[in-house]
Amino acid sequence: MILHKGETLFLQGETGPLYHLRSGLLKIVRVHQDGSQILVNLIIPNEIIPHHSLISPNPYYGTAIALITCEVDVLPAATWYEELEDNPERYRAIALLLQDKLRMMQQRIDQVTEVTPAEKLRKLQAWFQAFISPATLTDVLTQDEIGQFLGLRRETINRLLRSQAGSK
Protein backbone atom coordinates (compact mmCIF):
# COMPACT_ATOMS: atom_id res chain seq x y z
CA MET A 1 0.00 0.00 0.00
CA ILE A 2 1.19 3.52 -0.75
CA LEU A 3 0.53 6.38 1.69
CA HIS A 4 1.17 9.96 0.68
CA LYS A 5 2.32 12.75 2.98
CA GLY A 6 -0.38 13.56 5.53
CA GLU A 7 -2.40 10.35 5.03
CA THR A 8 -3.33 8.30 8.09
CA LEU A 9 -2.36 4.64 8.40
CA PHE A 10 -4.30 3.91 11.61
CA LEU A 11 -6.05 5.77 14.41
CA GLN A 12 -5.33 5.78 18.13
CA GLY A 13 -7.50 3.30 20.05
CA GLU A 14 -8.47 1.19 17.04
CA THR A 15 -7.40 -2.42 16.61
CA GLY A 16 -6.31 -4.03 13.40
CA PRO A 17 -3.38 -5.43 11.48
CA LEU A 18 0.30 -4.86 11.98
CA TYR A 19 2.31 -2.98 9.36
CA HIS A 20 5.78 -3.22 7.87
CA LEU A 21 7.15 0.12 6.69
CA ARG A 22 9.17 -0.64 3.54
CA SER A 23 10.08 2.97 2.78
CA GLY A 24 9.20 6.43 3.95
CA LEU A 25 8.72 7.90 7.40
CA LEU A 26 5.71 7.87 9.74
CA LYS A 27 4.96 9.88 12.84
CA ILE A 28 2.95 8.54 15.75
CA VAL A 29 0.89 11.15 17.58
CA ARG A 30 -1.22 10.84 20.71
CA VAL A 31 -4.46 12.77 20.65
CA HIS A 32 -5.60 14.01 24.05
CA GLN A 33 -9.19 14.56 25.17
CA ASP A 34 -8.93 18.28 24.42
CA GLY A 35 -7.92 17.48 20.82
CA SER A 36 -4.28 18.46 21.19
CA GLN A 37 -1.73 16.21 19.52
CA ILE A 38 1.68 15.23 20.88
CA LEU A 39 4.37 13.67 18.69
CA VAL A 40 5.52 10.52 20.51
CA ASN A 41 7.44 8.47 17.96
CA LEU A 42 8.93 8.31 14.48
CA ILE A 43 8.84 5.11 12.43
CA ILE A 44 11.65 4.46 9.99
CA PRO A 45 11.97 1.93 7.13
CA ASN A 46 11.93 -1.79 8.03
CA GLU A 47 10.07 -1.31 11.30
CA ILE A 48 7.02 -3.43 12.05
CA ILE A 49 4.38 -1.57 14.02
CA PRO A 50 2.77 -1.27 16.43
CA HIS A 51 5.75 -2.33 18.55
CA HIS A 52 3.62 -3.06 21.62
CA SER A 53 1.60 -5.59 19.59
CA LEU A 54 4.42 -7.68 18.15
CA ILE A 55 3.81 -10.52 20.63
CA SER A 56 0.15 -10.03 21.53
CA PRO A 57 -2.65 -7.80 20.20
CA ASN A 58 -3.35 -4.39 21.70
CA PRO A 59 -5.20 -1.27 20.49
CA TYR A 60 -3.09 1.27 18.61
CA TYR A 61 -1.33 3.58 21.10
CA GLY A 62 -1.40 6.56 18.75
CA THR A 63 -2.33 7.67 15.26
CA ALA A 64 0.17 6.92 12.46
CA ILE A 65 0.55 9.61 9.80
CA ALA A 66 2.85 9.63 6.76
CA LEU A 67 5.50 12.36 6.87
CA ILE A 68 6.61 11.57 3.32
CA THR A 69 5.39 9.06 0.73
CA CYS A 70 5.49 5.60 2.32
CA GLU A 71 5.30 2.04 1.07
CA VAL A 72 3.64 -0.15 3.68
CA ASP A 73 2.88 -3.87 3.85
CA VAL A 74 -0.27 -4.88 5.74
CA LEU A 75 0.33 -7.86 8.05
CA PRO A 76 -3.03 -9.38 9.06
CA ALA A 77 -3.06 -9.83 12.83
CA ALA A 78 -4.51 -13.36 12.85
CA THR A 79 -1.85 -14.57 10.41
CA TRP A 80 0.94 -12.79 12.33
CA TYR A 81 0.03 -14.38 15.69
CA GLU A 82 -0.62 -17.83 14.17
CA GLU A 83 2.84 -17.77 12.57
CA LEU A 84 4.35 -16.88 15.94
CA GLU A 85 2.64 -19.88 17.54
CA ASP A 86 3.72 -22.18 14.72
CA ASN A 87 7.31 -20.87 14.52
CA PRO A 88 8.69 -19.99 17.96
CA GLU A 89 12.03 -19.03 16.36
CA ARG A 90 10.26 -15.89 15.10
CA TYR A 91 10.33 -14.57 18.66
CA ARG A 92 14.08 -14.08 18.25
CA ALA A 93 13.49 -12.02 15.11
CA ILE A 94 11.00 -9.88 17.05
CA ALA A 95 13.51 -9.46 19.87
CA LEU A 96 16.06 -8.22 17.33
CA LEU A 97 13.52 -5.74 15.91
CA LEU A 98 12.82 -4.42 19.39
CA GLN A 99 16.56 -4.24 20.10
CA ASP A 100 16.99 -2.02 17.03
CA LYS A 101 14.15 0.21 18.22
CA LEU A 102 15.71 0.49 21.67
CA ARG A 103 19.00 1.55 20.09
CA MET A 104 17.16 4.21 18.11
CA MET A 105 15.50 5.40 21.31
CA GLN A 106 18.94 5.64 22.93
CA GLN A 107 19.96 7.98 20.09
CA ARG A 108 16.84 10.02 20.78
CA ILE A 109 17.76 10.20 24.47
CA ASP A 110 21.19 11.48 23.41
CA GLN A 111 19.44 14.17 21.35
CA VAL A 112 17.15 15.39 24.11
CA THR A 113 19.80 15.30 26.84
CA GLU A 114 22.20 17.58 25.00
CA VAL A 115 22.96 20.63 27.12
CA THR A 116 22.19 23.34 24.58
CA PRO A 117 18.99 23.64 22.58
CA ALA A 118 21.05 24.37 19.45
CA GLU A 119 22.90 21.06 19.78
CA LYS A 120 19.63 19.18 20.37
CA LEU A 121 18.28 20.61 17.13
CA ARG A 122 21.50 19.97 15.21
CA LYS A 123 21.56 16.30 16.25
CA LEU A 124 17.92 15.81 15.29
CA GLN A 125 18.51 17.45 11.90
CA ALA A 126 21.52 15.20 11.26
CA TRP A 127 19.54 12.09 12.24
CA PHE A 128 16.64 13.06 9.95
CA GLN A 129 18.91 13.60 6.95
CA ALA A 130 19.54 9.84 6.81
CA PHE A 131 15.84 9.32 6.07
CA ILE A 132 14.53 12.39 4.24
CA SER A 133 17.39 13.96 2.29
CA PRO A 134 17.21 16.20 0.27
CA ALA A 135 14.16 17.40 2.24
CA THR A 136 14.78 19.15 5.54
CA LEU A 137 13.40 18.61 9.02
CA THR A 138 11.00 21.55 8.64
CA ASP A 139 9.68 20.07 5.40
CA VAL A 140 8.18 17.15 7.34
CA LEU A 141 7.62 18.38 10.91
CA THR A 142 6.10 21.59 12.22
CA GLN A 143 8.03 23.73 14.67
CA ASP A 144 5.58 22.58 17.36
CA GLU A 145 6.35 18.92 16.59
CA ILE A 146 10.11 19.54 16.58
CA GLY A 147 9.73 21.25 19.94
CA GLN A 148 7.66 18.37 21.33
CA PHE A 149 10.21 15.84 20.14
CA LEU A 150 13.13 17.75 21.69
CA GLY A 151 11.39 19.00 24.83
CA LEU A 152 11.69 22.63 23.73
CA ARG A 153 9.17 25.41 23.17
CA ARG A 154 8.12 26.26 19.62
CA GLU A 155 9.48 29.78 20.12
CA THR A 156 12.92 28.34 20.90
CA ILE A 157 12.83 26.20 17.76
CA ASN A 158 11.79 29.23 15.70
CA ARG A 159 14.68 31.30 17.09
CA LEU A 160 17.21 28.49 16.47
CA LEU A 161 16.01 27.94 12.90
CA ARG A 162 16.22 31.67 12.14
CA SER A 163 19.72 31.74 13.61
CA GLN A 164 20.76 28.80 11.41
CA ALA A 165 19.32 30.48 8.32
CA GLY A 166 21.14 33.71 9.14
CA SER A 167 24.49 31.97 9.56
CA LYS A 168 24.38 30.27 6.13
PLM-predicted stretches and their roles:
Residues L42, V74, V140:
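Short aromatic/basic micro-patch
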Residues T79-T116:
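A small-molecule sensor/coupling module
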Residues T8, L25-R30, I48, E71-V72:
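Short beta-strand segments in beta-sandwich/barrel cores
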Residues M1-S23:
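Regulatory nucleotide-sensing modules
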Residues I55-A78:
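Ligand-binding loop in jelly-roll beta-barrel domains
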Residues I28-V29, H51, G62-A66, F149:
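Short beta-strand His + acidic residue motifs that chelate non-heme Fe in jelly-roll/DSBH
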Residues K120, L124-K168:
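Phosphate-/nucleic-acid-contacting segments
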Residues M1-I2, E7, Q33-I49:
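Short acidic-glycine-tyrosine-enriched beta hairpin
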